[in-house]
Amino acid sequence: MAGNQGNYRENPTRNEKKYKKANGQPRLKEKSSRAKSDNVCPYAKKCGGCDYQGVEYKEQLKNKQAYMKKLLKPFCFVEPIVGMKNPLYYRHKVHAAFDCTRRGQIVAGAYRKNTHDVVDIESCMIEEQESDEIIRDIKDMLRSFRIKTYDEDTGYGLLRHVLVRKGYATGQIMVVLVLASPILPSKNNFVKALRKKHPNITTVVLNVNDKKTSMVLGDRNITLYGKGFIEDKLCGCTFRISPGSFYQVNPVQTELLYEKAIHEAHLTGKERVIDAYCGTGTIGIIAAKNAGEVIGVELNRDAIRDAVINAKRNDIRNIRFYNDDAGKFMVEMAQKGEKADVVIMDPPRTGSDEAFLSSVVKLSPERVVYVSCGPETLARDLKYLTKHGYTVKRATPYDCFPFTSHIETVCCLTFQGR
């Protein structure tokens, strides 16, 4: 989701709600015929984050395929959903909230659905296992280092959250300690003890969040060990991942998703491409190898900073980045008489707004490659674009989040004229 840069709310792993209705589109229906799975999570009833918990993976894919076919039937053919060979332990970004019970027990894990009550979770079947082990050991270390967990009601305490990010291809690990204060007692000894347990840790960052807010990360980062970031490889390119950077959590499926998006763009080396909602520049940088020129546009300043670094890191010289609203940027391009051959759009789950879509129509690129993480908003946006000169032949869904109801989709729209 390239639009959800930097900070985020609560625990995106286990506490996201099911899709809400958009333009009268139905919800993803409850599974009436459940083929039982051997992979049953002991925290399922308390956590509530995995809508397909206990359902055989083939049945999950069958349900998602049927849902997408019904939803996109007015617009295009839906190709078979691309599932995973191994749908377990795929999340390479793991977040745990910390709290202390009335009995004094330190707990770490997910928020109970629709609450801020922390469910103590030792390991999660969709999270990278070493990351879970690190969080578990941090929880055990708190008492010996006399570190108090933060209390949201009183504002007392220090440790609020722990975020662990691991590079799939590089194996590099970043641990982010989210504290209510910039001061961590015995910080050097704490980091030393943590690295003794987990020598693979590449960097440790202290993130300061001293506000009464449901946002996980604050604005200030203090590097305690290492460089303050990690790197990972995707589609032959290397990307820098900072504490607040957006980077897809399922690298296996993301590579397939992005390869499909680039394929649908039909690049020959001459095209001018706009990467809207470009985030840290992943899709644009990958596309630049086969395009004439790429322009990345993103509102989040920190994401643009990472995008520029990523382009330099990969020696990509035919890409430029702008810290601007993508819709406004494209309207101004059209007013100046400038053209683009391809627009690649990867909006947040809420989809695009009419202002952005109208800017696409004004610019009238030959092809629009839509990378969607929200099926209902994809259908809504396709309805607008197909009414304004675009056609779409097919869409390909990807199961990037097994055991949840979320679906990513790639489709290419072609301009036929007004």
Where are these regions (language model features)?
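Short, solvent-exposed loop/turn elements at beta->coil junctions and helix N-caps
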Residues: 80-87, 152-153, 161, 165, ...
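Short helix/loop segment immediately N-terminal to the Walker
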Residues: 149-156, 273
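Rossmann-like S-adenosyl-L-methionine
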Residues: 2-31, 186-188, 192-418
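Short, acidic/hydrophobic/Gly-rich beta-strand patch recurrent on exposed beta strands
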Residues: 109-112, 176-178, 307
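Extended interfacial segments that mediate partner engagement and assembly in macromolecular machines
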Residues: 35-39, 45-149, 169, 184
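Accessory substrate-recognition/RNA-binding modules or partner subunits associated with SAM-dependent
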Residues: 120-122, 126, 131, 135, ...
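Nucleotide donor/acceptor-binding cores
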Residues: 92, 171-173, 270-271
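Short, aliphatic-rich beta-strand segments
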Residues: 99, 164, 171-180, 238-242, ...
